[in-house]
Each structure stands twice: as structure tokens, then as C-alpha cells.
Amino acid sequence: MVDVGKWPIFTLLSPQEIASIRKACVFGTSASEALYVTDNDEVFVFGLNYSNCLGTGDNQSTLVPKKLEGLCGKKIKSLSYGSGPHVLLSTEDGVVYAWGHNGYSQLGNGTTNQGIAPVQVCTNLLIKQVVEVACGSHHSMALAADGEVFAWGYNNCGQVGSGSTANQPTPRKVTNCLHIKRVVGIACGQTSSMAVLDNGEVYGWGYNGNGQLGLGNNGNQLTPVRVAALHSVCVNQIVCGYAHTLALTDEGLLYAWGANTYGQLGTGNKNNLLSPAHIMVEKERVVEIAACHSAHTSAAKTQGGHVYMWGQCRGQSVILPHLTHFSCTDDVFACFATPAVSWRLLSVEHEDFLTVAESLKKEFDSPETADLKFRIDGKYIHVHKAVLKIRCEHFRSMFQSYWNEDMKEVIEIDQFSYPVYRAFLQYLYTDTVDLPPEDAIGLLDLATSYCENRLKKLCQHIIKRGITVENAFSLFSAAVRYDAEDLEEFCFKFCINHLTEVTQTAAFWQMDGPLLKEFIAKASKCGAFKN
């Protein structure tokens, strides 16, 4: 859970103000500005206000939070900031707002006048639903829901991707190699830009003096170029530091390239890399990576919840990933980055009181208050009939009819394993699933049998994070068997992206004939067997 109190600037707020925060961002050259959103969707800013980056309509700094009336109720979804700084955000409705430093037209309004208050960015974006924004030092990018990318602002190294080095005063669609391709993620270094496609390909453009584009050379690129060295993997997340880049694949593999003055690549030395290198090879599967164009710090979180950091950490050069005691990558930047900015828009949850949901969670498997027990594999799980009836249609029918189970104090379960059934009952109390990927297939089977559609989605999410070349086809088969369409499509795409390796696994050849034929036919339709 993110604790905004780890950022020094938030010590200016009262406990009541801290308790109201649901989203937040710390930015600025000295981490001296902050924006936060409260639980009733009011937006506040405070801090130094350099270059009017607070958007308050004046150039006055403030230690007391000021409300940005124009953004209240807008439901901020994505936020980024530059070095000026300028601030860029998009709302859940896909609308983009910008303010602050504008010396290079990075606000996208066609001028170089500083923006003293949030103003909607309209040119070429008015009819687009923007789902993500990203900022370099003085350039901006926006990703639309249809996969198109727009860029504007400072373009001295080609970071706008227009094919020239002329500054771009308004949003311009990035084309060339990205034409008719669908981008699903964007990131900016100081003067470089990166994009991830829906098929896992990675493209980069802009400044490449440190090899941060991963192209095997250090020549600047005025238009997007594919990172060919990653052709054998499928990337699903990319982040940029000041002059380095990290990429995370769908198999949980982490790659790094670019500047390495502070060890931010995690390779064990300080040599720059012009091409991607696989790091954290001996660690467990990585599920999240973090970096920020303002800093030379890198962080990663593994499937087991372990958080690692490396690079510039409080003045030290950490050249290998170092295991921390943090629970999230955000804490690394709060405590060790220079400046101590946030690498993304923070989402905050609070535990300052016991909610109804938390009370229910506390009573799961509590013999003191339970009125029913399940016995699975000789082990007992204590539950409450009322909770089961409220949360599950299957149990509502069981306890409101003439089923024999309605009169029992102990119910035997033999069709599911203890870990699976316990995870299911715990889900009814907590609305979350705590189960390793290898057991999630059994829970997916249970969710299908009990018609628990939301639980099916949670199982699919867990399974997706645990997919590997070895189990991909088995998971595809399970998805088909349990009518999990989203998981089926995900597993199918994974198999296609790793077709050679998947077809050499035992799971592939152990599949029954009809399913194998169906897979081959579908793969053929999407061009998997083209020369």
C-alpha cells in the first residue's frame, strides 16, 4: 500500500488531509511540488510553483493546499510532468489538460506562453479518447484508446517523431513505422520516446547518445524505429529513466539498456548498453518495473511481492538490484530517488479504521463466530451461513431450499482441493483471491461450476501473470474448457508470440485432436505460418 507520508513534502499536511488523499503525484526539479485528489474527487496543489506548474492562476508558491476548481470532479486517470516543469493529465473521459512551463510549446496550445492554469489540449485530440500521457523534459505524448500516439513540444533530437528537428507547437500524430499499428503503452526519457505495441514490439525515437533507444548504435532517430533486439520476446510494460530504458515481457523477464553512469541498468557495472540486456536473471518473475525521466533510479517488483532497487540511490551507485523491505516500487522513489519524485500517479488506500469489508475479512475462518464448517481433505474451514447466502447464489439456493446441507453443521467437499476451496470461501469474505497461479486453474473450474463470473475474471488475471512457455498451451486448453474467452485470447496470443517454443512442449502434443486442430486453424487465420 502506498503511504504518501514517505514523501517529505506531504508532512506539510494535517492527518485529516492525508487521510482524504486517494491519488497523488510529487514532481519538480527538487520534488518541491505536489498534486493530490481527495476521496470526493477534489484536486489540490501546493509547493514551490516554479514556472506556474501548480496551475493556480498565479506564480505564488504555497505551503497551504489550493484547490484547482477546474479539475475537481474530472476523475484524473493518467498524469505526467516535465522538467520545466509542465504538467499533463488525462481524465477517465479521455480529455487532456496541460499547464506550466511552455518554452518549447510542450503544452500543445500553439504558443510558448506559460500556462498559469489547466487548459484542455484540443488540437487533434478533441475527438480522441486519451488513455495515457507521458512527458519528457520538454516534450509531451498522448496515447489514444484506438492505439494512436500524438506528440508535441521540444524536438531538438527528434523526440516528437515528426521526421525533423523542428519544435512541434501542437499535438501531431506519430506515424511512419507506427502507421496502422496499435500502441498500448508509452514512456518518455528526457529527450527520447518509447512505445509498446499490442503484439509486444517496442519502438523508440529521439535522442540516442547513450543507447537508450536500444538500437545497437547511438545515433538519434527522427522517426520511430523498432528495437530489433527484442524480436524474440513480447514486451508488455516499458519505462524510461533520465537516459535509460527498462522493458518487462509477458514472461516476467526484465531487460535494460542505455546510460549506466550510476548502475541504473543493474548489470553489475557502469558500462552503457546500446542494446537490451536481460537482468535479474536469477530472481523470481518480475511483475512491475519503475523508472522516471527525472532520476537515474530503477525499481522492480516480483511476483512474490519483493521490491528491488538499483541505480542512483541517495547518492550511492547501486550497480545490482538490491532487495528492499518496501512493499511497492513507489516507496523506492520516495525514499531513495534524487529528486524524490513519484514515477507515476499514486493510488492510495487507507487503513485508518475498520470498515464493514475489513470486519468481514477478519471473521473469515473464525471458530468463535462461525455457524458452519466445511471439511476438505481432513481440514476444516469455519464460515457464516449468512455471509455465504449474501455473497453467492449457489449457497443461497443451498440454504434456502430443501437441500440436506441446509440442516448440517459440517459439509464435506470432495470435488475440489483444500487450497482451492479455502481461496473461494476467503474470496466471499474479502473480494480478493490469494492463490498461486498453479492453483488458479482449479479455482477457475470452481468459479465456472458456481457461476461466479467476477471470480472467473480474477482467476484469469492470476493465470495471466503465471503464464510461461511450458504451461501456455495447458492454460489455453483450460480457458477453452471453462469458457473463459478473455483468458483464451490472451493465452492464444502468448502461444503465437512464442509459437516455436510452445509447439515443442509436452503440453502441446498431449492436447486432444479437436482442440489442436482448432488452435492450428486459428493460428493460420492470423498469419502465424507465413514465410
From Swiss-Prot:
InterPro entries: BTB/POZ_dom, RCBTB1_BTB_POZ, RCC1/BLIP-II, Reg_chr_condens, Signaling_Regulatory_Domain, SKP1/BTB/POZ_sf. GO terms for cellular component: cytoplasm; nucleus. This is RCC1 and BTB domain-containing protein 1. Its main location: nucleus. Residues 370-437, 470-499 form the BTB domain. It holds the Pfam family BTB. RCC1 repeats lie at residues 40-91, 93-145, 147-198, 199-250, 252-302, 304-356. Disulfide bonds: none annotated. Keywords: Cell cycle, Chromatin regulator, Disease variant, Nucleus, Repeat, Transcription, Transcription regulation. It is linked to Retinal dystrophy with or without extraocular anomalies: An autosomal recessive disease characterized by progressive retinal dystrophy, chorioretinal macular atrophy, reduced cone and rod responses on ERG, and decrease visual acuity. Extraocular anomalies are variably present in some patients and include pulmonary fibrosis, sensorineural hearing loss, and endocrine features such as goiter and primary ovarian insufficiency. Ubiquitously expressed. In the retina, present in the nerve fiber layer and to a lesser extent in the inner and outer plexiform layers (at protein level). PROSITE patterns: BTB, RCC1_2, RCC1_3. GO terms for biological process: chromatin organization. It is found in: Nucleus. May be involved in cell cycle regulation by chromatin remodeling.
